[in-house]
Amino acid sequence: MEIENRQAKHNYFIEDTYECGIVLKGTEIKSIRAGKCNLRDSYGIIKANEIFVLNMFISPYKEASIYNESETRTRKLLLHKKEIKKIAQDVEQKGLTLIPLKLYFKGDKIKLLLGICRGKKNYDKRESLKRKDEQRQIEKAIKCKYYCVPVMFLYCLF
């Protein structure tokens, strides 16, 4: 089960990514296994040499009534100290943002792909959409070239 933040690629330039662990409660893990998680509005902050993710929505687990946590509580991310220092330098010096890109299982553990991102302006978004559309048209033309039989060739056979 992979939960992806699709808006992140549209709204940000992704400079670098880090795979990190995340501290969760038991009912939150069960909700994530069921696919009841949303990364769209979430972001990361650095506080006292630790990294936290805010606003990550994990819906409450149905079968656990009293043990459910708040849906958008602050969750701690697990990284090496060297990685945290490098991320902190990048965020402070370059003015970058920490954005969760993907939540997935690696074995029996849940991992979060954390991206160090720079925000896109509206003209950047339009340019990337144009580039994507052009690439799609090129692929369509190549596909048609290999799989479409020219009409003149068909007339020659009959």
Residue ranges and their predicted role:
Residues 1-50:
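A positional/architectural concept
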Residues 26, 46-48, 55, 114-118:
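Flexible glycine-/small-residue-rich
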Residues 51-52, 110:
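Hydrophobic residues embedded in beta-strands of well-ordered beta-sheets
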Residues 119-137, 141-144:
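Enriched for short, Lys/Arg-rich terminal
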